[in-house]
Structure formats: C-alpha cells, structure tokens
A protein has these predicted regions:
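Replace the tail clause
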Residues: 1-190
C-alpha cells in the first residue's frame, strides 16, 4: 500500500502497476522486458486519469502486461524521477508536462518518452499504441542494441545537462531579483 492519489488511482487497475523499487527493476531485468514508467504528480487531475484511461482499453492492458513491467511513479514521492521528467521534456523541446510516459531499460536508461498532454490530439491509448509499435519492435529485434544505445544516449544527455547547469546565469542580486519576481507573480493575482 503506497500513499497518495497517484497510487490510489491505479489500485483497482487491470494493469499490473508496480512501484519504483529495486524489486520492480529486477523483475524487468529477469524477464528481459522494458519498464513502462508513468511519472505523474497528484496536483494535476489528468495524472490520476491516465492509469484509468489506459486501463479502459483491453488491448492496451493486455499489451502493457505482456510486453512491459509497468511502473507507476508519484513524481512528488520519487523526486529523482520528477527531476528527470524536466530534463527529458527539455531534450525534446517540450515544456514540462505530467504525466510522462517513459520506456526504460532494466538499467534505468530512458529509451523513449512522451508527455501525455491533455487536450492534445490523440488519446493516451493512441499515444501508447503508436509508441509501443516502434519501441516494442526495436526491443524485440535487438534488446542488446537498444540497451547499449540507451546507455550511451543517457551518458550524453547527462553531459549536456551538466553543461546547461554550469552555463546558467546566476543572479548578481538574488534577494532583489527574488523580490522583483515575487511582486510580478503577485500582480498576476491582483
């Protein structure tokens, strides 16, 4: 029993959601499956709906349970994945969006990811099906290649993230800038 709305929304799901724990990653390794990780945050209503939308399609449920170790993550509770979401969205020139569906190797290297943006074309099930067709086929054809390539991509991504972090311009007057930003935010609500 895990606390929070994100996990409660998936309790009765026919998808065999697992928590983000070592045993789940080991399950993926032993079964030679990718992990299908859905990172959500409870503050967004669409996050609670995503597991139920996926669960409403019997063919998606069967494919997820057969092909992946499905993992549901509360981005607030598992902060490292919440932070990873920002970096992954940045990599595809997208704003930060939750929930984020990520296909990961058993070594936790992202293979592919897609933000599940509400009110955009395509339902959650359609987005899953399209991506599954591509990612699932690549994994079936040569999971060794996918693992090596994803590891290399993750190393390169980490290097880019470190460079971006070191290039960030820090404020010369953090207190004054913070106060100015707070005043600007306050005017939005006046």
């Amino acid at each position: 029993d895990l606390p929070g709305m994100v996990y409660a929304a998936a309790e009765a799901s026919p998808i065999h959601w697992q928590p983000w724990v070592k045993e789940s990653r080991e399950m993926a390794r032993k079964s030679h499956k990718l992990m299908l990780v859905v990172i959500a945050i409870p503050q967004q209503a669409s996050c609670a709906l995503t597991p139920s939308r996926l669960s409403s399609d019997p063919s998606a449920v069967a494919e997820i349970n057969r092909s992946y170790v499905p993992i549901l993550v509360d981005g607030d509770a598992v902060r490292e994945l919440g932070i990873l979401t920002a970096d992954l969205c940045s990599e595809i020139s997208s704003g930060l969006h939750f929930p984020l569906m990520v296909w990961m190797t058993p070594d936790c290297d992202p293979v592919a990811w897609i933000p599940l943006v509400p009110n955009e074309s395509g339902s959650v099930v359609e987005l899953f099906s399209q991506s599954h067709g591509m990612v699932g086929n690549m994994w079936e054809e040569d999971h060794g290649y996918v693992s090596r390539n994803s590891r290399m991509d993750q190393e390169n991504r980490s290097a880019r993230i470190r460079i971006r972090a070191s290039e960030r311009e820090l404020s010369a007057e953090p207190a004054a800038d913070s106060l100015r930003a707070l005043r600007q935010l306050t005017t939005l609500y006046d």
